[in-house]
Swiss-Prot record:
One Gene Ontology cellular component: cytoplasm
Molecular function terms from GO: 1-(5-phosphoribosyl)-5-[(5-phosphoribosylamino)methylideneamino]imidazole-4-carboxamide isomerase activity
Keywords: Amino-acid biosynthesis, Cytoplasm, Histidine biosynthesis, Isomerase
Protein name: 1-(5-phosphoribosyl)-5-[(5-phosphoribosylamino)methylideneamino] imidazole-4-carboxamide isomerase
Entry superkingdom: Archaea
NCBIfam families registered for this protein in UniProt: 1-(5-phosphoribosyl)-5-[(5-phosphoribosylamino)methylideneamino]imidazole-4-carboxamide isomerase, PRK13585.1
Organism placement in taxonomy: Archaea, Methanobacteriati, Methanobacteriota, Stenosarchaea group, Methanomicrobia
Gene designation: hisA
Pathway: Amino-acid biosynthesis; L-histidine biosynthesis; L-histidine from 5-phospho-alpha-D-ribose 1-diphosphate: step 4/9
Biological processes, Gene Ontology terms: L-histidine biosynthetic process; L-tryptophan biosynthetic process
Localisation per UniProt entry: Cytoplasm
EC main group: isomerase
Natural source organism: Methanosarcina mazei (strain ATCC BAA-159 / DSM 3647 / Goe1 / Go1 / JCM 11833 / OCM 88)
Length: 246
């Protein structure tokens, strides 16, 4: 299995942004045209894009749906897979995205508050289209745009969602997210070894070495945001690092 590097296109107020630890107002990147950003990553070799509606994640209102649909329609024609998260709170929200050609919907808060939703979506659309985001802070699950902490651990919830029909997991270590201080592979490795479905890692990648480190955990891929936008390395360099021997 190829370890995939997935560029993040996070959107807030119709712009492509990168936040520090998900905190509104902490933008370190703000670009007016998310579609142009998405197409730029595709031209540089991205096979999958990670789109997040931050307005949806933080406020529960998916304000960036029109631009997401534009990106999906444009990238579909180029054979690029799109995974979308942020504010998907209901079966209808998820279905509307899958029906326009989104490859994978990412459920966070909704899955934790209503686990049956995972079962319903995987039964209706197939488990390969359903991803559950497990965002962890201090070893515990965090929800509602990282503003509330739960008692459960990522391993407990990962096993539960695999049983319910999730086809993959997205694991974000909030402790390192957006800080550009490197990754902690331990929690990712623990989760990978606890489930049999693919785990995509996210949070804190700042060097090519971080990509190699996460590959060694057995993860299926990594979402990269700030490091790419700030020019720490190019997407081509990241893809080559992911393909290299470890």
């Amino acid at each position: 299995m190829v370890f995939e590097v997935i560029p993040a296109v996070d959107m807030r107020g119709g712009k492509c942004v990168q936040l520090v630890q998900g905190v509104p107002g902490s933008e370190i990147v703000s670009i007016d045209d998310p579609l142009a950003v998405a197409l730029d990553w595709v031209s540089k070799g991205a096979k999958t894009l990670h789109l997040v509606d931050l307005d949806g994640a933080i406020e529960g209102e998916r304000k960036n749906s029109p631009i997401i649909e534009k990106i999906v329609n444009t990238c579909k024609e180029k054979g690029v897979s799109i995974q979308v998260g942020g504010g998907i709170r209901s079966f209808e929200d998820a279905a509307s995205l899958l029906e326009i050609g989104v490859s994978r919907i990412i459920l966070g808060t909704a899955a934790l508050q209503n686990p049956e939703l995972v079962k319903q979506l995987s039964s209706s659309f197939g488990s390969s289209h359903v991803n559950v985001a497990l965002d962890a802070k201090n070893g515990k699950i965090s929800i509602k745009g990282w503003t509330e902490e739960c008692a459960q651990t990522p391993v407990e919830m990962g096993r539960k969602f695999e049983e319910l029909g999730a086809g993959s997991l997205l694991f974000t270590n909030i402790d390192t997210e957006g800080l550009m201080q490197g990754v902690n592979p331990v929690p990712t490795k623990e989760l990978v070894e606890s489930v049999s479905i693919p785990v995509i890692a996210s949070g804190g990648v700042s060097t090519l070495e971080d990509i190699k480190t996460l590959k060694k955990t057995g993860a299926a891929g990594v979402v990269v945001g700030s490091a790419l936008y700030m020019g720490r390395f190019t997407l081509e360099e990241a893809i080559n690092a992911a393909l290299g021997d470890i």
